Curated annotation (Swiss-Prot):
This is Ribulose bisphosphate carboxylase small subunit. The keyword Aminoacyl-tRNA synthetase does not apply. InterPro entries: RuBisCO_ssu (IPR024681), RuBisCO_ssu_dom (IPR000894), RuBisCO_ssu_sf (IPR036385). In this alga, in contrast to plants, the small subunit is encoded in the chloroplast. The basic functional RuBisCO is composed of a large chain homodimer in a 'head-to-tail' conformation. In form I RuBisCO this homodimer is arranged in a barrel-like tetramer with the small subunits forming a tetrameric 'cap' on each end of the 'barrel'. GO terms for molecular function: ribulose-bisphosphate carboxylase activity. It holds the Pfam family RuBisCO_small. GO terms for biological process: reductive pentose-phosphate cycle. It comes from Pyropia haitanensis (Red seaweed). The gene is rbcS. It is found in: Plastid, Chloroplast. SUPFAM superfamilies: RuBisCO, small subunit. Keywords: Calvin cycle, Carbon dioxide fixation, Chloroplast, Photorespiration, Photosynthesis, Plastid. One of its GO terms (cellular component) is chloroplast. The keyword ATP-binding does not apply.
Length: 138
């Protein structure tokens, strides 16, 4: 099952050339960027691990691409994404986020249903990947 989080998530995976074009857009707008990774793909997991430091005042997209490449080498079977932040209004708001790397096998999710009083149904998602310990999921 393909995880669909962030911009472009319903499109085929971006090539490095397409990623470079998005990074050039980020730099041209003066946005800050960062690279994050995780092996827990749950949609509500908003606490991905930060790779290195946030890239403030970057003038060249190749600096961000270098960080992506470094993260890919160190974490080849993890989800890796780029976030871009705009601070023009005095706050850091995420304006662009997209996945640049995926595990070869994405095991998917289990939908758990529970019956409650009054014919109420409650649902929860469980990622099959999290059945293994962190760092050994893919």
């Amino acid at each position: 099952m393909r995880v669909t989080q962030g911009t472009f998530s319903f499109l085929p995976d971006l090539t490095d050339e397409q990623i470079n074009k998005q990074l050039a857009y980020i730099v041209s707008k003066g946005f800050s960027a960062n690279v994050e990774y995780t092996d827990d793909p749950h949609p509500r997991n908003s606490y991905w691990e930060l790779w290195g430091l946030p890239l403030f005042d970057v003038k060249d997209a190749s600096a961000v691409m270098y960080e992506i490449s470094s993260c890919r080498k160190a974490k080849p079977n993890y989800y890796i994404k780029v976030n871009a932040f705009d601070n023009t209004r005095g706050i850091e708001s995420c304006v662009l986020s997209f996945i640049v790397n995926r595990p070869i096998n994405e095991p998917g999710f289990l939908l758990q249903r529970q019956d409650f009083e009054g014919r109420t149904m409650k649902y929860s998602l469980h990622s099959y990947a999290t059945e293994k310990p962190e760092g050994a999921r893919y």
